[in-house]
């Protein structure tokens, strides 16, 4: 039974959830209704806040198959609950007449997943998701995704499009003809409208949601309570504050919704043409598109309303919305395996692996290319929220909660305050009963103590520091869409950097070329643009093997391609639409050298000149293009020289990959050494290759050939050497981070040795440090996976004869201190393939490699995300800085992701820098640290404020008195609010320091600081309260009491006689009240100064002019009304007149209190800096962070780091813990 009741949906995915079924129970509902009436609606609120309780209180468990309501719980660390109502989709609403037409409609794919099943099997397709007789499908919607009941798996499953389980063959064979109108209508019923609907909630809806926040409900309760106790002014002030807070909150929430709505509305409804089965073209709204529709891409381009795979023609697309890369990308049609080499036909289509053939939703198609008047067609694979843009919008609409120790501790602290309030509550009731106070008064006063202990202004106070930090970040050009992350950035202790465009300049400069002739390298050449090379295959490859296109007459495309094309100085011409329509086999793109290079290229006499005039029109047409793929690390083209019978294939890409696809006899013997020399110097190297194609390959065959048939058996032609200069600010920024004990890691798509060289140049790896390259090989031919360890020579050792000798001595890890993890003497470097193998087969090595991994090269976008996760698993707080191009996932996953791209892709990143420079990283960390320390200061201050006020009220309750309405008002508005909002204004300290701020409130030093201040304040308040009773002039105060000088007293009393009867009711005017009011008012200011920390994370508090001015003004004002009473002020604040001598005594109490408080707070700071490290080293305490614990372990591990030229093998059978053994190869 239990198995039937609890199931998992989205298994293995980020949004994996447990699902439980429930049915509504009438008797439970009746009991809950009664409870709601009895509690005056409070139970209803409680059930509104807790979906789990709501469902369990009103429903009974049921089998998921037949339930009315589902309860969902996330399986991550947050264990969040959601509930959703089951709805029924009736297929009878759509006129499906005969069973025959029904099976036709289903033969193209069943209801949930449009895989290609045989028609017979698909006849039962619908019954998987519904009861066939009634034609009804049960489903629920959660976070904008529909989950349908699937009978095959006996669970709910979300609707998939053509992006899963569909082979490339079937895309052409089964889906390229288009849908019938009936099938389209049927799918429309299931998939719904194709739109990413970001509904902007009405102000009323937002208001209700905001007002029903537990915090505002507590404030409402407080206001009602104070009003019944006749604290009208204070209640009114809190109401005004709450309204201001709600209005500002509503404004910012609605503004974000409107921004998001505008962002997705650009393509929400456009008119599109679709092909139907009978070749007819129908024009429909984009909202009516369903997976399987064949969409015609218009000539003049469009904004894509869905994800679609190209099956005809070529498109130039701007994908900046998704990737942040403003460079136009060329998309070609999906290779058709049925006309290609056999054996590839089973490859499944996947939008990620086939992204060069997929047009993504929200991206802009700038131009289309087509042949022989054919239409450019694409098959819709995903619609609505399933599209790549839809998923991005969903991640913004439903973000994962940020798990940060500070917030967890804040809740714990609030619980402590509630416990303290509970004690006060019981004390007040007992004290009032003993003094025979009326029941009504007891209830009001005992509840009042709760509202005093839990300060209503706490959430506003806590966010003040973050808001100010956000404003300061904006001033230095860093924009933030997730303000809560600013505090988390204060904890960052490791930052990952992308290389190209982040650490180095965006563009590459051509340094030179090194050609190969007869399998030997020629000497490097600087100039490619000369007559000698103009007709060489090498230059032809540079001229044709690229994805450049002309947009409005300007060459655009990949910056690397542009640089290469500009270096040869050729001209690119593209066919116009008219030409394409006229000629049967027009080549869409033609390249030719400039005229001045050609005639001079023939050093012939006049008589021969005429013969050369004809072929002087030397042109190469690009027949077919296989775009660059980061997975394959290469691109290739098929081209033909004008007049030649045979076509040529050209290829360029990563040297290792290109060399492996060339005939071994054409690759120079010293290829590896030459390549290594260039990469060690930090050059980016690209290899070129070429081969003549067979004459039987016609233009038409080439259009359908697979790239594997072209990309083999090539002739190696040589290398292009590109220079990627470091950005000017890079070394200085990295040095600042190292000084601050913040580790830096490079994650790049570039060659490993180039990356290691750049890491050395920028100071990420110091000259004396060792680099260990981990080369992991997957299991093959029955052999287990293994890692080969090589020690990369440092640059200085390259030409040194002792290079081999030095490799034999591994350098042992040296630490100055535990924290000083940056002082490691060795670094690991690996590429993406090795990283994947290690993750899969060597799980126990992953944490060790994370501790010292510095260079990760040739990393694919998803591997970057996996790396961030692996670092977070060893308790690093990880920052990621990239240009947004392919770092979206990593930027989102990191604790603090900062994108250097101003484009819309930055919606994936919590932070975006206006200036594309990594100097924003230390700035962000500094501001994060300042905001974090501000949060601590404010929290400590608010805690003290509530305890001081709580104790003042408890003392006064003991004599059946209380603070007056205007006394509360003065303390809460004039003192607390002013202090809280000005103490948060301290700007960040000028530089990053090695010390790191604490991450949580529950730390020894912090708790000791708060507790010591509480004891001091309680002590001095009690001293004043009890000492005033010992004074010779003291008596229980009554309207005619005269403790002051006669004249002063008469003046004061005469002005008050009218109001006495009213004031006596609450017994507010007495000597104890006046004493406690003055001492506590000073105490608030004393702890504000004590807690306003400056160095090393914030500027000193004397530089915070608003704070200094506010505190001085309040000090002077309180001191003035204490020493020189003003009748009108005393009347408003309900202060009684006390002798001048007692006023001076109070001043002395306050001064001693200030001295003790500030001295103790300073000593706590000193104790933390001096004694804590000593105590830790004496106690041999195990560090909390996994990486620090691991560092301690590795210090005594004789087997680590691995010795050079050794191999680590995975143990074949023990797979679950990924154990491994080390084998030394001699």
Swiss-Prot record:
Q: Which GO terms describe its cellular component?
A: early endosome membrane; late endosome membrane; recycling endosome membrane
| Subcellular location per the Swiss-Prot or TrEMBL entry | Recycling endosome membrane; Early endosome membrane; Late endosome membrane
Q: Which residues does the annotation say bind ATP? A: 498-500, 628, 684, 750, 883-887
Q: Which UniProt keywords apply?
A: ATP-binding, Endosome, Magnesium, Membrane, Metal-binding, Nucleotide-binding, Phosphoprotein, Translocase, Transmembrane, Transmembrane helix
How does the protein's chain sit in the membrane according to the entry?
A: Multi-pass membrane protein
Task: Tell me which parts of the chain lie in the Cytoplasmic compartment.
Answer: 1-28, 50-205, 254-409, 470-940, 984-999, 1095-1105, 1165-1226
User: Which Gene Ontology terms describe the biological processes this protein takes part in?
Assistant: intracellular calcium ion homeostasis
Q: Which domain of life is it from?
A: Eukaryota
NCBIfam families in UniProt: ATPase_P-type (TIGR01494), P-ATPase-V (TIGR01657)
Lumenal compartment residues? 227-232, 431-448, 962, 1021-1073, 1127-1143
> Quick one: which residues bind Mg(2+)?
498, 500, 883
Transmembrane portions of the chain: 206-226, 233-253, 410-430, 449-469, 941-961, 963-983, 1000-1020, 1074-1094, 1106-1126, 1144-1164
The protein's Enzyme Commission number: 7.6.2.16
Instruction: Kindly list the positions at which Phosphoserine occurs in this protein.
Output: 98, 817
Enzymatic reactions: putrescine(out) + ATP + H2O = putrescine(in) + ADP + phosphate + H(+)
* Family indicated by similarity: Belongs to the cation transport ATPase (P-type) (TC 3.A.3) family. Type V subfamily.
Q: Which GO terms describe its molecular function?
A: ABC-type putrescine transporter activity; ATP binding; ATP hydrolysis activity; ATPase-coupled monoatomic cation transmembrane transporter activity; metal ion binding; P-type ion transporter activity; P-type transmembrane transporter activity
Where do intramembrane regions occur along the sequence? 29-49
PANTHER family documented for this protein = CATION-TRANSPORTING ATPASE-RELATED, POLYAMINE-TRANSPORTING ATPASE 13A3
| Function noted in UniProt | ATP-driven pump involved in endocytosis-dependent polyamine transport. Uses ATP as an energy source to transfer polyamine precursor putrescine from the endosomal compartment to the cytosol.
Pfam families in the cross-refs = Cation_ATPase, Cation_ATPase_N, E1-E2_ATPase, P5-ATPase
In its UniProt entry, what is this protein called?
Polyamine-transporting ATPase 13A3
């Amino acid at each position: 039974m239990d198995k039937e009741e609890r199931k998992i949906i989205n298994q293995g995915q980020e949004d994996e959830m447990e699902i439980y079924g429930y049915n509504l129970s009438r008797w439970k509902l009746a009991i809950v209704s009664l409870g709601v009436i009895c509690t005056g609606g409070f139970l209803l609120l409680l059930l509104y806040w807790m979906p789990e309780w709501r469902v369990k209180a009103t429903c009974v468990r049921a089998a998921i198959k037949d339930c009315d309501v589902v309860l969902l719980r996330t399986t991550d660390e947050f264990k969040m609950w959601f509930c959703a109502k089951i709805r029924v989709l009736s297929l009878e609403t759509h006129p499906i007449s005969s069973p025959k037409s029904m099976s036709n409609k289903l033969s193209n794919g069943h209801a949930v997943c449009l895989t290609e099943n045989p028609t017979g099997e698909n006849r039962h397709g619908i019954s998987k998701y519904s009861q066939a007789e009634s034609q009804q499908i049960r489903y629920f919607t959660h976070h904008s995704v529909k989950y349908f009941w699937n009978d095959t798996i006996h669970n709910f499953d979300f609707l998939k499009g053509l992006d899963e389980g569909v082979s490339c063959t079937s895309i052409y064979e089964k889906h390229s003809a288009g849908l019938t109108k009936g099938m389209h209508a049927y799918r429309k019923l299931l998939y719904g409208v194709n739109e990413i609907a970001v509904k902007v909630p009405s102000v009323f809806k937002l208001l209700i949601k905001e007002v029903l926040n537990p915090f505002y409900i507590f404030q409402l309760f407080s206001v009602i309570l104070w009003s019944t106790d006749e604290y009208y002014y204070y209640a009114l002030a809190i109401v005004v504050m709450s309204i201001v807070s709600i209005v500002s909150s509503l404004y910012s929430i609605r503004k974000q919704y409107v921004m998001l709505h505008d962002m997705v509305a650009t393509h929400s409804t456009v008119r599109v043409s679709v092909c139907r089965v009978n070749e007819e073209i129908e024009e429909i709204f984009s909202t009516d598109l369903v997976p399987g529709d064949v969409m015609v891409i218009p000539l003049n381009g469009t904004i894509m309303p869905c994800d679609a795979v190209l099956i005809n023609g070529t498109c130039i697309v701007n994908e900046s919305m998704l990737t942040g890369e403003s460079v136009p990308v060329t998309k070609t049609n999906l290779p058709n395996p049925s006309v290609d080499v056999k054996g590839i036909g089973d490859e499944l289509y996947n939008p990620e692996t086939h992204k060069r053939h997929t047009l993504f939703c929200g991206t802009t198609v700038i131009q289309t290319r087509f042949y022989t008047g054919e239409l450019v067609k694409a098959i819709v694979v995903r619609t609505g929220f399933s599209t790549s843009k839809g998923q991005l919008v969903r991640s913004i609409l439903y973000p994962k909660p940020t798990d940060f120790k500070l917030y967890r501790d804040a809740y714990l602290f609030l619980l402590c305050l509630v416990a303290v309030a509970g004690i006060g509550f019981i004390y007040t009731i007992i004290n009032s009963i003993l003094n025979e106070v009326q029941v009504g008064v007891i209830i009001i006063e005992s509840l009042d103590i709760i509202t005093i202990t839990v300060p209503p202004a706490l959430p506003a106070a806590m966010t003040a520091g973050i808001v100010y930090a956000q404003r300061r970040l904006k001033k230095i050009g860093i924009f933030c869409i997730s303000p809560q992350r600013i505090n988390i950035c204060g904890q960052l202790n490791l930052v990952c950097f992308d290389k190209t465009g982040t650490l180095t300049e965006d563009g590459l400069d051509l340094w030179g070329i090194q050609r190969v002739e007869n399998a030997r390298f020629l000497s490097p050449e600087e100039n490619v643009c000369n007559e000698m090379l103009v007709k060489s295959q090498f230059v032809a490859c540079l001229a044709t093997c690229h994805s450049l296109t002309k947009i409005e007459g300007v060459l655009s495309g990949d910056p690397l391609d542009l640089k290469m094309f500009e270096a040869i100085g050729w001209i690119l011409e593209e066919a116009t639409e008219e030409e394409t329509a006229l000629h049967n086999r027009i080549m869409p793109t033609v390249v030719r050298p400039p005229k001045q290079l050609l005639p001079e290229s023939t050093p012939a006499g006049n008589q021969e000149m005429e013969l050369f005039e004809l072929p002087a029109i030397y042109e190469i047409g690009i027949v077919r293009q296989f775009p660059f793929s980061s997975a394959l690390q290469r691109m290739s083209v098929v081209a033909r020289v004008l007049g030649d019978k045979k076509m040529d294939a050209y290829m360029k890409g990563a040297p290792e990959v290109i060399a492996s696809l060339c005939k071994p006899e054409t690759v120079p013997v010293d290829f590896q050494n030459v390549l290594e020399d260039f990469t060690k110097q930090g050059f980016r190297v690209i290899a070129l290759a070429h081969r003549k194609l067979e004459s039987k390959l016609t233009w038409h065959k080439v259009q359908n050939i697979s790239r594997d048939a072209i990309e083999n058996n090539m002739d190696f032609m040589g290398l292009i050497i590109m220079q990627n200069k470091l950005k000017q600010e890079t070394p200085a920024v990295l040095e600042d981070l190292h000084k601050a004990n913040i580790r830096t890691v490079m994650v790049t798509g570039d060659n490993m040795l180039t990356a290691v060289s750049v890491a050395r140049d920028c100071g990420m790896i110091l000259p004396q440090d060792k680099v260990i390259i981990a080369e992991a090989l997957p299991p093959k031919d029955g052999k287990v996976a293994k890692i080969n360890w090589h020690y990369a020579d440092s640059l200085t050792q390259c030409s040194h004869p002792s290079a081999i000798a030095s490799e034999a001595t591994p350098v042992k890890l040296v630490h100055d201190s535990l924290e000083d993890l940056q002082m490691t003497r060795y670094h690991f470097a690996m590429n993406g393939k090795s990283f994947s193998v290690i993750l899969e087969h060597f799980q126990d090595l992953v944490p060790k490699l994370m501790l010292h991994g510095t260079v990760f090269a040739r990393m694919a976008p998803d591997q970057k995300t996996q790396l961030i996760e692996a670092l977070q698993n060893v308790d690093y707080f990880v920052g990621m800085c990239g240009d947004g191009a392919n770092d979206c996932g990593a930027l989102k996953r990191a604790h603090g992701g900062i994108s250097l791209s101003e484009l819309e892709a930055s919606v994936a990143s919590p932070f975006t820098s206006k200036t594309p420079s990594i100097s924003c990283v230390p700035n962000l960390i500094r501001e994060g640290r300042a905001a974090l320390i501000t949060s601590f200061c404010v929290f400590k201050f608010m805690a003290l404020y509530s305890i001081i006020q709580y104790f003042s009220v408890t003392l006064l309750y003991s004599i059946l008195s209380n603070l007056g309405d205007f006394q509360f008002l003065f303390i809460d508005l004039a003192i607390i609010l002013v202090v809280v909002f000005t103490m948060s204004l301290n700007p960040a300290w000028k530089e990053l320091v090695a010390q790191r701020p604490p991450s949580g409130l529950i730390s020894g030093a912090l708790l000791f600081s708060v507790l010591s201040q509480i004891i001091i304040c309680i002590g001095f308040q009690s001293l004043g309260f009890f000492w005033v009773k010992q004074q010779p002039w003291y008596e229980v105060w009554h309207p005619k009491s005269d403790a002051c000088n006669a004249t002063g007293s008469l003046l004061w009393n005469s002005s008050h006689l009218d109001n006495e009867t009213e004031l006596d009711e609450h017994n507010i005017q007495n000597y104890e009240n006046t004493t406690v009011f003055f001492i506590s008012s000073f105490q608030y200011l004393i702890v504000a100064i004590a807690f306003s920390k400056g160095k090393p994370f914030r500027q000193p508090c004397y530089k915070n002019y608003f704070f200094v001015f506010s505190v001085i003004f309040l000090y002077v004002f309180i001191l003035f009304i204490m020493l020189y009473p003003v009748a009108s002020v005393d009347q408003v604040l309900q202060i009684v007149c006390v002798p001048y001598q007692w006023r001076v005594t109070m001043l002395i109490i306050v001064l001693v209190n200030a001295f003790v408080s500030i001295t103790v707070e300073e000593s706590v700071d000193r104790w933390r800096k001096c004694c804590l490290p000593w105590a830790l080293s004496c106690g041999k305490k195990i560090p909390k962070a996994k990486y620090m614990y691991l560092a301690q372990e590795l210090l005594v591990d004789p087997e680590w780091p691995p010795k050079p030229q050794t191999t680590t093998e995975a143990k074949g059978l023990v797979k679950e813990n990924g154990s491994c053994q080390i084998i030394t190869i001699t």
